[in-house]
């Protein structure tokens, strides 16, 4: 039998519409966990950067967009059904050590985090959801279903995998509804031997605390590399005071834009020709240095391209290089799912949609102050007209929800 994991996050930088009540949203059950939140944050950041480097290596000169937290959660759910070396490989790649943490604490920490992120009432909308589509002929252990439901709020559905097109439609319709139509299709060409599909969803809808004025947006050049440029819609904001840090050691500028509520986006702009140097330095300590060094700074003019990027990854080609191998092979031991060693993971599909545009707060809070020349200092201008990085974080624990490398703002 084969298990497929489908992961489909969407990050939307605009407030159009509201999120419906039919999403997989669950109230926070404030359970204590022995896994320290700072430890979980560092572990998740370490995994995020390791995965980023592998995706960037395998996709040179292409946009990279992914949700490390979404991928971690899907793998953690799979690990609930794993034993032996299969389990150890997954947890080690996620940066957990079973000699230092109890497995129960790991899952409680993850589940608690996902519930906290999904709490209603925040002005930033974050929806997390997990669904398991199980072939009607597959006998899944009650304990596995109970644990996935209790720890990760996984909703289980039965399907007929002998009719793959019907099952694909069932799964894709569910994904389309959960992502507010941003991801139209997650699975296609299901293999006949597939007997279970795990779907993980993370939907982020953020509104800028200080919005860009659409009247200022204009067509401009974005320099993909030294030889090629593309036309983009360049957003502009004037007289903005926002956290900023100039990292001379790594030759990059770091700027934070806040969303209303409890999230923010960190934009990292390497100097020309210094992207690889910045990428090589990505580790939890670097992120901590940047965040600790941010100070409010008056930006006279900020230029940021409007973004609409989608990516599609087959992570079964990437995760083995990070150390997760057994689960994709005949050696897979997922006997805590069915009670037998006859199940392996065939695919891990990760689809992401990243949209960022001008609109921000519900109040039309003004950005309308015009630039006034000052004597004594040159104007501070930050222009994102070449490749840059983005890390979207929730202020609860500063976990990276989404990470992106923007090579071409209008490309896939």
Swiss-Prot record:
Lyase as UniProt keyword: no
Keyword Secreted recorded: yes
Alphabetical keyword list: Glycoprotein, Protease inhibitor, Secreted, Serine protease inhibitor, Signal
Region named RCL: 360-386
Site (Reactive bond): 374-375
GO molecular function: serine-type endopeptidase inhibitor activity
CC annotations in GO: extracellular space
Top-level taxon: Eukaryota
Secretion signal span: 1-20
A single BP term in Gene Ontology: response to cytokine
Domain remark from Swiss-Prot or TrEMBL: The reactive center loop (RCL) extends out from the body of the protein and directs binding to the target protease. The protease cleaves the serpin at the reactive site within the RCL, establishing a covalent linkage between the serpin reactive site and the protease. The resulting inactive serpin-protease complex is highly stable. Variability within the reactive center loop (RCL) sequences of Serpina3 paralogs may determine target protease specificity.
Similarity section: Belongs to the serpin family.
Protein name (Swiss-Prot/TrEMBL): Serine protease inhibitor A3M
Source organism per UniProt: Rattus norvegicus (Rat)
Lineage: Eukaryota, Metazoa, Chordata, Craniata, Vertebrata
Gene: Serpina3m
